Regions:
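Acidic/glycine-enriched connector segments
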Residues: 1-167
Length: 169
């Protein structure tokens, strides 16, 4: 990977009425990253945010050929299943590189993938609804621990932790 690197994390289950807003915000963050000198973009190729990010980066690559997209796939069978879908296979073929984190599935494989992306990135774009659990929340916490730049795109109604919720009678 050459140049500065940016990756994405976000939810798979997004409110349908927010998808256009999310895509617009992602496009803005990708454009801002490119303006800031980022040339390498990484995606875990999951459904939802990851796929939108891939499409948007590849659109921009048509006018800015120096941009590179790296697919970071958690395990080999996941890559095999992605390659069975024509559109996803085309997206993978457009990548500068495909990194497979490990050969076999283990419950921790998605955390390992997310960790790899953060460790190899200078900036992380997070599409996040405030949930304290799940892969996106863990990736955001890891981003903070690694002292990497984080750009958050809020989604829907932010879910407050219990201790911050207003008390009801």
């Amino acid at each position: 990977m050459k140049g500065k690197t940016c990756c994405v994390t976000g939810h798979r289950d997004l409110p349908q009425n927010e998808i256009n807003k999310i895509k617009t915000a992602l496009a803005h963050e990708i454009d801002a990253a490119a303006t800031d000198g980022f040339t390498c973009f990484m995606s875990g190729f999951a459904d939802g945010v990851d796929q939108y990010f891939v499409e948007l980066v590849l659109e921009r690559k048509q006018t800015t050929p120096a941009l590179e997209l790296i697919a970071v796939i958690p395990y080999r069978k996941r890559l095999d299943s992605l390659n069975k879908k024509t559109r996803t296979r085309e997206l993978l073929e457009a990548c500068a590189d495909v990194v497979v984190i490990q050969e076999k599935y283990l419950p921790s494989v998605y955390s390992h993938r997310n960790r790899y992306m953060v460790e190899h990135s200078d900036r992380v774009i997070a599409v996040y609804d405030g949930r304290e659990t799940g892969g996106t929340a863990k990736t955001i916490r890891f981003t903070h621990r690694m002292k990497k730049e984080l750009r958050e795109i809020p989604v829907g109604e932010i879910v407050l932790p219990d201790h911050l919720k207003p008390k009801t009678k």
